[in-house]
């Protein structure tokens, strides 16, 4: 009995304990540092009148005494038992409590109240729950001005910063940019005071295609990272877009059934008009892994009608093709049908392409989504199955029958229920299934659609039975709600044995508890929730009650259709209006409140070139970002209350029950597995590629399949492949493609289907290689406007015919962020004109302008077209003469005008087209035609030291010597620069910190990695000098910003050359170089603070360098950039000293980025430097070092503070090699080859002589010597002397000879100038004067050593004139002279060592029989007139492949024109065996006028495995070809070029081959157009030719015709008009071609008159020049009377040369036999009388 009473008492006590009072604690399961935490506190089961006070706070689980937030007090009572608190979490307090030191991101939410201990008899007054914490907070949205960019373009971007509530946030942001390889190229911290940050950066022009990323985060929140991506690829905007539109979004296939396959090909111009032309369509299959197999025999060639055509595949035909591939229709579901279409428009022959890759074979036309159905049953409550049915386009499918089969289990028994219901307008169906209380499990099978349904299944179970019951949330019509609507629900307790008073519920949205509520319980408890913007885009309703001390809960997830932003932003233009280029458009901006509106306009053509995957920011993306803070997982519900709370994203504790801490910030993802299909694709090329498994081998095979633009056998090509592993697959695939091409040719033009069986071109070319064409601007309107409810902008439209999309984003303090629906406007002219001009032409070349007229009106037009008169151009009728052209409706017609430029200038061409009176249409285009002078540009530089303290140096005379090759009537210019401050000139805003950086200091290209580093190195030296001497104020205010920009550009660009292991190669495809990697490590270590680079990445670079060190200390270079043996080093076989010293210098600078002093890597680097120094010291001690190796070794040992004895030996060796000239000290060069010994620099004869300019090697060596001397003795006499010599070696631009000598010299001089800086001010007065044709010209300059004054006065004077300089003052200075003029010949070059030859041939078709190479199909050859049906022969895939690779023009000419306008360039280079190069060589080819090189050809020469060049660049009319070396035997490369605008009488152009590191070592030649080419014929009409020849001389033939000189016309010409300067009777000896001139060498037989040619006597020779475009012919052996004006040029002997022009008298002297005839006797006597009178008496006036 006692036991029984004990049990009864215990049970009663237990029941009472369940009803005990308690505190309930709710909060989001993740804490956001810096964002207030919403905490709900509830008092449960407390007696009436009870008041509980306490506080809530956060703490560190490991440091419980360290609070991570302030304490927030609360007070609860039985009447106010459920409240919501906000607990602030300041960033500073989170750091103080050491949260950042925790390995696991956990924090404790605690409630503290004495009531917990006093009333509940607990041992503590605290209760808590564990939460995760994250520093992610707020929202950052990024926007770029385009979705896709070309390499070399500038990216403009914006960052919008908002807080957790979507309101503007003014925080410090960290913005980073990553390139396509994932390397960080830019990092900066910025402050956005208006919550919008804008910036831009430049994509390097050598960037590989790929996806770049811009990321932003709040600087104090590492997890708040947000990013946007954009694509970088080579493209040109299309003129029209091709779309492939399937009739159905899927292809239905089931066993024994296949639906129809129909597709529409649509082509429209960007401005919306349909394209006329032909569509070529082919099909293939795409596997799940992206593998592509083409279906041979299904190709189609169809004419477009009104811009589109329909292609239908017959079932039998399609199934027959599948059977050939052993593919059954049963294998098709899960695969995709690939469709590729190429459209050629008939008016211009332009081609664009498109592909469709998303057309799936499906077993059902629908998809079934059951994710919104809850996973738990509530016994006795109807279960709601929610299914969403979509079609294959992803759109909701309405009115689709859905069948549901429910199998209900109760113990071992079951029963079935079947339902059928149609989906509503949103594609949703809700089926209510009655569930008796005894049911424990329901198995559901669902099918949607008929007869080929989508199916799905689901099993749901009931929780274990419990006395506390279940909470049912009834929503009669589940659907997404809209803002402003009210959610009405019923709450019901099911299966409960007792009673309770209230239901409690919470609204949770975006990871925060928005509100808490309680509702009295009734028979049917109804609650209402008003949906506002705070609940967008979804929220959770979490309801609970307590019964018997046990919480019972349920939840519901509700999606909200926002429909738009919280505020309002509308962009309105009058879209119904027809806009034309240059029109003003009114853009209306409407907002709900005052806001900043960020605008941008982008050409919609960008979305056609690959930008579709990077669409602009819209509200969908904004809502996705907002919803990313939702911590809930699933549709709601759970087996227990803690599970319900956890699934809704809440943490919960009541002292007895609590939620488990969540495992991660995101929801667990369902693991999905899918069986991969294995379809046997049998195809010739695929089988070939399938032989190789590695990506490298596949790439080599792909390269072998690609045809070169020049004749090479496969064996010759394979011999150039450097990697042995690549050579075999390359050769095999090359031979395979060669055999296919042979078959294609020998079989002739087979049908299209059979041709496709021979070769599938897509297997040879990546789709990314397909270029797209246009010349349109790509974006504009990048601005931020402040708008207060309404604003109207008046915008001027660009001159493009396209469709613009205007984007707008507003930021308001009251309504947050809003992204407007883009406004589109079409810019179009029904009648418009298109005109192309060449990059440049030369004087007296003839070109044909061919404006194309487009008529999109419904009526034919008669149009009058003319070219406006302009000075310097010869035009038909003098300009203004119009041509009448008939342009039919809906067509295009070209009009031809011949033009001859006769003046070297930038000429503004204006073409005007006007309609008739009945059709007042018109258009006008104005473009600049760049007209260059004949010949090639030649430059001369001289440097003088200005020293007024030396009496002999106070007066200088700069001679005016003349070059015999100078172009007559040229532009003779001398630029003079004077400075009294060498540091500020070299390092200031006009030198290393000029807008172009070192690029402006050197006339060298900027392609490879080492050239890229020159953007960084000099700028760092300049910044260091200006920082140390505090002289930034001496320069323009923007100079500091420019320096930062230059450093950032260099850093961004060099990352494109970085390899995964941290090393660097000269090119992207080149193996890593030790020397270059060391160079990068040194410069980036110095730039680390300014570029925000990754120290870890530089540590990887240092580690790679250590791996290149040998055991005995020296470093080796597996792939040298510079052949150091040619630049010093050791005499003998050891060439590693200079390299080892260079790496030591780099590693020393790299110590700054290594970890702390005790790190293993630091010890390894220090040990490496020590071993290398031991090696260097031993070599220095041997005494065999050359001057360069001695200088860099001495500097390396001094820099690293090597042992004293080693440093002293190196110093003594270096000084023993020094040379001195007066007060200057320098080091020359001793090389390994006696033939390469550079002669010592001669000493100047006097202070007034120009300073001799040393080679690059001497400059670099002296710079290292100066760096060593500064460390050895500081600023002392020796350093002064070396710096003085080095300063005077600078070029006119401020640089030196090449990159390395410039980089090292500026580094050394900046260090010297820092050491020698003085604030003392000194003055320098300079007077420059010269006597020219216009008289004496003088300039007076007053300079100081702290002022940069640059004079670039164009002193244009007759050659032979001199410049006198007078110097006064007490400061030294420098005077530099640059002469610039054009020359006719290249005889003064050094082509004895290096050789280059350029030949140009008319369009060449290589055939296997003739050239043992591949035939050259031209895609443009397919075009035969404007009628697409004229294509009588089908297009083979080989033509598509080869033609696409060659297509590079905007408007493809017809086949006949193509053969005339395309030429083949062959560039051959070689050197004599005794001459070496320092390293890289560059061929600079100036193309013939009007031509541009085919990039596709050049890319093949650089990108394939059989690489022929390292790199190429195109700039204007120049093509730069980079070669690693110049061979001793002749080696040639070839590429095609196309002349876009017809040019006649094309003049020769120049080509230069030079040593990059020693540019004076060069060979320069001229080359001309192919013989018998139309390029050499005339294009002009009669009056235009007459105008062009207006300056040409004409031979006088009056005597030949027997005309008598009754009026003395010879004497009038000689003495009155034009009154000549000379008169000679000469005999022509020979004729010679000189560029654009012809030279006649003559011997004087009689001197009649002279002015300045005082040395002219009989039997002397004189040269006469005439333009090659003139028709004058002087025959050798004949005598002529020649009179005219004096020339401005001189021959090699210093005698004047004469230009024959319209002011020249040229008359053939008659023979004695002619003068004996009766007809000519009197005229001959009159001629002899003139010769006698004029020769003895001259002019009598």
From Swiss-Prot:
- Going by the UniProt annotation, this protein carries glycans at 60, 225, 326, 1241, 1325, 1388
The pro-peptide lies at: 674-677, 1447-1450
GO CC annotation: axon; dendrite; extracellular space; synapse
Q: Where is this cross-link: Isoglutamyl cysteine thioester (Cys-Gln)?
A: 1008-1011
Q: Where does this one sit in the cell?
A: Secreted
Which residues are modified to Sulfotyrosine?
1414, 1417, 1419
Give each disulfide bond as a residue pair: 68-97, 633-667, 700-726, 701-733, 714-734, 1468-1532, 1580-1585, 1592-1670, 1615-1739, 1715-1724
Q: Which residues form the NTR domain?
A: 1592-1739
Superkingdom per UniProt:
Eukaryota
Where would I find the Anaphylatoxin-like domain in this sequence?
700-734
Q: Where is this site: Cleavage?
A: 754-755
The answer to whether the entry has keyword Phosphoprotein is yes
Q: How is it modified after translation?
A: Prior to secretion, the single-chain precursor is enzymatically cleaved by plasminogen (PLG) to yield non-identical chains alpha, beta and gamma. During activation of the complement systems, the alpha chain is cleaved into C4a and C4b by different proteases depending on the complement pathway: C4b stays linked to the beta and gamma chains, while C4a is released in the plasma. The alpha chain is cleaved by C1S to generate C4a and C4b following activation by the classical complement system. N- and O-glycosylated. O-glycosylated with a core 1 or possibly core 8 glycan.
What's a Pfam family this protein contains? Answer: CO4A-B_CUB_C
Q: What else is known?
A: C4 is a major histocompatibility complex class-III protein.
Q: What does this protein do?
A: Precursor of non-enzymatic components of the classical, lectin and GZMK complement pathways, which consist in a cascade of proteins that leads to phagocytosis and breakdown of pathogens and signaling that strengthens the adaptive immune system.
Q: What is this protein called?
A: Complement C4
